[in-house]
């Protein structure tokens, strides 16, 4: 016994001491990969700044975005008083772009959230149960995919009526099949894994398997696609507002601002440039952030 204890102590002494801060969790691995991607980090900072601006836009904006009118400077370009210039009604474009960030970002995020929630549920059911569940859900997705996204959104808004709330519903509807197919594919792969068979063998219910084992395995893919889909949704919402089907004047939504700027683009191009630039930078940032998240969450990528 004494010899055994001596040998055990010798083995323990030979083992390197691992400090708590040296233990690498999945979060540490993700952060290590993500922070090496400079474009993704820049995009993440931009998105964080955009979210802060959107939350506090009403307080940050130097002028009232809807009820301030400077009739002495109609269509004037950028100046110290009005950083982005003034539109044809005398409204401060900088203030309207800031408040527009709140509306456009909320429309994009809520639309994708609704589409992701419904699409994830349908994808889990189709991939796990297969059979008629799978055939029914996938045929519905095929029908929705047969229409161009913006055309489907226009049709939905035409039925429901104009307004930002209906735009969110319309954009969410054509986001559903994309998430459903993504989650279905992941579910079909995960349900064949041995840990799923083990869960079944101990009597785990289908609900437990779906929520505790399969859904967590699809989260990384959902997060990446969710992030990139926000940019698409912002463009779609802005397009509908540009066509007069979304936010209505004087609401300072970016697409609606572009619609109002059409008549003055030749004599006052700044009226359209700044809302368009806001859309471009926001969509680019979300796409770059999504690319960075995908690379950081991909277990095959080594630092």
Swiss-Prot record:
Keywords: Cell inner membrane, Cell membrane, Membrane, Transmembrane, Transmembrane helix, Transport. It is a multi-pass membrane protein. PROSITE patterns: ABC_TM1 (PS50928). One of its GO terms (molecular function) is dipeptide transmembrane transporter activity. Residues 101-290 form the ABC transmembrane type-1 domain. InterPro entries: BP-dependent_transpt_permease, MetI-like, MetI-like_sf, OppC_N. The chain crosses the membrane at residues 40-60, 105-125, 144-164, 165-185, 222-242, 266-286. It holds the Pfam family BPD_transp_1. It is found in: Cell inner membrane. The complex is composed of two ATP-binding proteins (GsiA), two transmembrane proteins (GsiC and GsiD) and a solute-binding protein (GsiB). Belongs to the binding-protein-dependent transport system permease family. NCBIfam families: PRK15082.1 (NF011662). This is Glutathione transport system permease protein GsiD. It comes from Shigella sonnei (strain Ss046).
């Amino acid at each position: 016994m004494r010899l055994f204890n001596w040998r055990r102590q010798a083995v323990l002494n030979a083992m390197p001491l691992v400090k708590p801060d040296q233990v690498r969790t999945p979060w540490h691995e993700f952060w290590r990969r993500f922070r090496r991607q400079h474009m993704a980090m820049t995009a993440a900072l931009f998105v964080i700044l955009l979210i802060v601006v959107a939350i506090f836009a009403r307080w940050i904006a130097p002028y009232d975005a809807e009820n301030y009118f400077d009739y002495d400077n109609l269509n004037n370009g950028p100046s110290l008083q009005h950083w982005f210039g003034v539109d044809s009604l005398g409204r401060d474009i900088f203030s309207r772009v800031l408040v527009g960030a709140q509306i456009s970002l909320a429309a994009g995020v809520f639309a994708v959230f609704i589409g992701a929630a419904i699409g994830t549920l349908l994808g889990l059911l189709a991939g796990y149960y297969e059979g008629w569940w799978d055939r029914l859900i996938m045929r519905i997705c095929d029908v929705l995919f047969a229409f161009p996204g913006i055309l489907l959104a226009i049709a939905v808004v035409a039925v429901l009526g104009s307004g930002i709330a209906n735009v969110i519903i319309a954009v969410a509807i054509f986001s559903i099949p994309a998430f459903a197919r993504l989650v279905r594919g992941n579910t079909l792969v995960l349900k064949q894994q041995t840990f799923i068979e083990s869960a079944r063998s101990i009597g785990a219910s289908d609900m437990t398997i779906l929520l505790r084992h399969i859904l967590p395995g699809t989260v990384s893919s959902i997060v990446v696609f969710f992030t990139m889909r926000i940019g698409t949704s912002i463009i779609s919402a802005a397009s509908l507002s540009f066509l007069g089907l979304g936010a209505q004047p004087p609401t300072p939504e970016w697409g609606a601002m572009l619609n109002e700027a059409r008549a003055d683009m030749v004599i006052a191009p700044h009226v359209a440039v700044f809302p368009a630039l806001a859309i471009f930078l926001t969509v680019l940032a979300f796409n770059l952030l999504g690319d960075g998240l995908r690379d950081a969450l991909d277990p095959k990528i080594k630092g």
